[in-house]
Swiss-Prot record:
Annotated residues for binding of a divalent metal cation 2: 72-73, 170, 212
Keyword annotations from UniProtKB, A to Z: Hydrolase, Metal-binding
Lineage summary: Bacteria, Pseudomonadati, Pseudomonadota, Betaproteobacteria, Burkholderiales
Annotated positions binding a divalent metal cation 1: 68, 70, 143, 170
Top-level EC class: hydrolase
This protein's name: Probable metallo-hydrolase BURPS1710b_2304
EC number: 3.-.-.-
Stretches assigned to coiled coil: none
Amino acid sequence: MTVEGFFDPATCTISYLLFDSGSGECALIDSVLDYDPKSGRTRTASADQLIARVAALGARVRWLLETHVHADHLSAAPYLKTRVGGEIAIGRHVTRVQDVFGKLFNAGPAFAHDGSQFDRLLDDGDTLALGALSIRAMHTPGHTPACMTYVVTEAHAAHDARDAAAFVGDTLFMPDYGTARCDFPGGDARSLYRSIRKVLSLPPATRLYMCHDYQPNGRAIQYASTVADELRENVHIREGVTEDDFVAMRTARDATLDMPVLMLPSVQVNMRAGRLPEPEDNGVRYLKIPLDAI
């Protein structure tokens, strides 16, 4: 198992390439379509880095995984699918996100709320094959109702936590930054606490890969820790922090946070599996901005 991270400084997002060298198969996780909110321009520079690395490895893309419907960047999954293939997968509870935001954006009857925009909807405990690797979907709601953690192990080997990895999306961050916010529609701090405890019940040596790193105090980029690191050092949820204490802390902290800059553009695209709106009769695509609604 090889894991490579690709950091996008504009959104502090880490996209991942998960590679099984024996089979040559790979998965791309939480990709980014570059978007400039001032000009409305999209670019594919971040996604093209993944494409170049896939080509350099001679890999075959089997899965394009989303840990959740992101509210801080646009997904590049459809672009990647056209360039390198792969099936787009997300947690089945994406339908709850589609219900909420379909109404907010007045998406109309043409917008299906059944997750059919994605190739594969995953339930808790579902597994995906990637060569000799097994990817298990672990439902970890709290940040959003649809959040999934992807736990990766060798499919046919005796379990060894040193060879296990989990892509945690927006649940945990590096120990010096803590945990994800829970104040988006459908978010819930108590659910997040329980989800994180589920992640932290994995073997202590399991490597945890973050979806974001905000470089507190200007430190260098970091995006991987272990279960043991988080239990020992996480500033929000280390061992000994009770559920009630966490909920109180998370609720108070969330009340001070601004909305992500790209939330409105991101969600209306990502609830459609990253597909941009169809051009109107003048050949131009448009995003919607609801006024005084959030």
